[in-house]
Amino acid sequence: ILAEVGRGGMSIVYLARDKRLNKQWAVKEIKNDGKKSAKTLLKGLEREANILKNVDHPVLPRIVDIINQDGTIYVVMDYIEGDTIQDRLKKEGAQPQELVVEWGLQLASALNYLHNMNPPVIYRDMKPSNVMIKPEGGVKLIDFGTAKEYEIENNADTTALGTRGYAAPEQFGDSKGRGIY
């Protein structure tokens, strides 16, 4: 472990280096917060890992290992250097149109790739804090905790997931009587 690089409500992300391969990885440490059982938490992580272990797209990260040790879960994944779009907007404000269009094209390509997987994967938490801008200018879509494989037999998923303000209004019951139609 080289350094702490991020912290969220339930997790800490570290930068680590594999000495044998001389490769940097991100290691997400997730402790059971008492609100969710470790079993439920592990199931969600396994779902995320199973989705990401099968991807091969430049905008999508890879998960290489999940370790469950004494109630703490460690997820080893690609280390993505850079800022999130949210961080960039806070620091610099509005970005040039050409750059934003390029980011949009890259993200659309990643979503198209996910939707064409078998089974299709639905990414359900698109927001500026879940898109990393790499130093060379490309983007990476992160945080697949709410992503889901589409089940054709179960198209009546009523689970509200995502982030208020970024998710569809009907996810949080905010759309009744609103809209232009």
Predicted feature locations:
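Activation segment signature within eukaryotic-like protein kinase domains
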Residues: 103-104
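Conserved activation segment of eukaryotic-like protein kinases, specifically the C-terminal portion
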Residues: 157-170
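Protein kinase catalytic-loop region centered on the HRD/HxD motif
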Residues: 109-121
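Protein kinase glycine-rich loop
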Residues: 2-8, 13
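Conserved short submotifs of the Hanks-type protein kinase catalytic core
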Residues: 70-84, 88
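AlphaC helix of the eukaryotic protein kinase fold
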Residues: 31-54
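Activation-segment/catalytic-loop signature of the eukaryotic protein kinase fold
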Residues: 66
